[in-house]
Amino acid sequence: MEDVSHMAMRRICKRIAGPGLMFTEFVSAMAIHYGAVKTFRKMRIHPEERPLGIQIFGGEPAVMAETARIAEEMGADIIDINMGCWVPKVCKTGSGAALLKDPDTAEAIVKAVVGAVQKPVTVKLRAGWDYSLFAAPEMAKRFQDAGAQMITLHARFAKQGFEGEANWALIREMREVVRVPLIGNGDVKTPEDAKKMLESTGCDGVMVGRAAIGDPWALARIRAGMMGDPIPEAPSLEERIETARDHARMHVALECDAYEFEEIEKTGADYSEAERRAIRSLRGLLPLYIKGEPGASQVRARITHCDTLGQVENILDGYLCERRALLPVG
């Protein structure tokens, strides 16, 4: 998920939810080809994240193979090829879900990437470009024959975006033709959703995306439900705010090419520009940690004007103090 599943988010999810395969934000192969520093930063991996797949996108087999080799060198456990992004700026380059309209190029990309690396190669795709053709089954067969070791299907068509409900029956149809592990994706928000998807489709696992934005505890609940363990209690307001603080601090560190905020504090170097970039990129995400709480909309409005970590922490701490003051005494 672009600008969401960065290292800070992934580390928080891993700490809260425990074992599970995660993927980076998608990485533009063409940007890597031209040496974009910001894009290289997306491929950095922290040891606590593993296993971790680096997801790449592009429309040229040779450039995709080159990027896959770099991702492997940077420590990826899996190379995942994105053929599901429906956003126009991606599709107009012949990348992402646009490849659903060009199965020959899509297959050539999979072959090129598989031939370029030793790590497993996986593919994430949508059901098809539009309702006129459920393209995924035939394409998945070609991908597995080309060497892909896992397929993830988001059970919507590209033209849908995120509109309507995911059609899990499409995953069941895919199960009939795909012999490699098949992962279902789309509208899994609760433990009950995950179990229903597994039981109704025969898929081998579930991928959760949007449900974890601002609520990484959803992953812990879903995992517990799938494993038959007790469902964890909902986090306290204090825990959610502390997690938002950790998220912000780790993301500032990432923009400074460090793992922990304390590392950059010790150097004494000026990190104000990196801090500004990091905090601005989190303006829409951090308020989601307290979504639904009284006064959350006011907090969101204030954070949208923040440029520094100190400003964010002051707003969150002030909000927590206000909420504590309203609690009954005794």
What are these regions (language model features)?
Residues 1, 27-29, 57-59, 84-86, ...:
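Active-site beta-loop-alpha junctions enriched in small/polar residues
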Residues 1-77:
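Glycine-rich, positively charged N-terminal anion/phosphate-binding segment
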Residues 2, 8, 108, 116-118, ...:
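Alpha/beta catalytic cores of nucleotide-metabolism and tRNA/nucleoside-modifying enzymes
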Residues 11-17, 65-79, 83-95, 103-180:
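Alpha/beta enzyme core
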Residues 22-24, 52-56, 79, 121-125, ...:
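Hydrophobic faces of well-ordered beta-strands that scaffold small-molecule active sites
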Residues 35-39, 102, 153, 167, ...:
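Short, solvent-exposed helix-helix connector turns and helix-capping sites enriched
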Residues 39-41, 94-100:
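Short glycine-enriched, charge-decorated loop/helix-capping segments at active-site entrances
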Residues 59, 101, 307:
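Residue-level signal for the nucleotide or nucleotide-sugar donor/cofactor binding architecture
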